[in-house]
Design a protein with these regions (language model features):
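Topogenic and prosegment regions of secretory-pathway hydrolases and membrane enzymes
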Residues: 1-243
Length: 243
């Protein structure tokens, strides 16, 4: 879909050496965005870079007692090459996540101070940390799942949440050891503010289509075949569920 096409353009983008001379990442993002797209990387995987693409749609809000409230989130249990990553141990790898979605704008609020009155809804993503359990991750992201006992490690991301969430194509990446990445196999896509939530009318049942793109990149060890095997072993098993 076009959601995935534009997501892959951003997902493949890299900062040039000249762009990297701007040391402050926030300033670099303001001036250069995500960098220069790589057409070959956007179209093809290779032995050292495997990409997952998930297309879905989320109903961000539901009707509450006194108004619209946040709906459920999508929880992805990824078909992960866990054994291969564990065997790679301390080798440094990169996981990159891109979320591309569409909104319906409210033109009357364009350019005004309240940024959440322009988009109909906003979506965001989060990734399980290497040290938290599946239950702890769910509780951290959804208070209905139980008491929150862990915190998100915001320092692990390169772009950081506040900067990446300013648009409808959000991309960020983490560089870590393969052993740590082996434990980071869960992603959630969840709703944020938007004018659909503030105005009752008929907006509560509306859904937001999105594309979630996830890549594992390595420098030394081939990863593509291990990812392909992990996917083959999960055929017929749901990867995403509402929670």
């Amino acid at each position: 879909s076009m959601l995935s096409v534009r997501g892959l353009m951003v997902h493949s983008a890299r900062w040039t050496a000249e762009m990297m001379r701007i040391n402050n990442v926030e300033e670099r993002m303001t001036l250069c965005g995500y960098g220069v797209p790589d057409e070959h990387a956007a179209i093809y995987s290779n032995e050292k870079c495997a990409t997952y693409i998930f297309e879905n749609q989320l109903e961000p809000y539901t009707q509450g007692d006194s108004g619209n409230i946040y709906g459920k989130m999508h929880y992805y249990n990824l078909p992960w090459p866990k054994e291969q990553l564990e065997d790679m141990g301390d080798e440094y790898v990169r996981i990159r996540i891109t979320l591309s979605y569409y909104v319906k704008p409210s033109p009357g609020y364009a350019g005004r101070t309240h940024k959440y009155r322009y988009p109909s809804a906003t979506l965001h993503f989060d990734l399980k940390t290497a040290t938290e359990t599946e239950e702890e991750f769910l509780c951290r992201r959804n208070k209905q799942e139980g008491e929150k006992t862990t915190q998100n490690d915001a320092t692990r991301w390169n772009v950081k949440q506040q900067k990446r969430e300013r648009g409808t194509v959000q991309s960020d990446w983490i560089e870590c050891t393969a052993a740590d990445l082996a434990e980071m196999d869960k992603i959630v896509v969840f709703p944020g503010p938007g004018w659909w939530k503030e105005r009752k009318l008929d907006n509560v049942d509306n859904s937001v289509p999105y594309s979630l793109i996830v890549s594992i990149e390595t420098k030394k060890t081939d990863i593509y075949n291990a990812v392909e095997t992990a996917i083959s072993n999960r055929i017929g098993v749901p990867i995403a569920q509402e929670v």
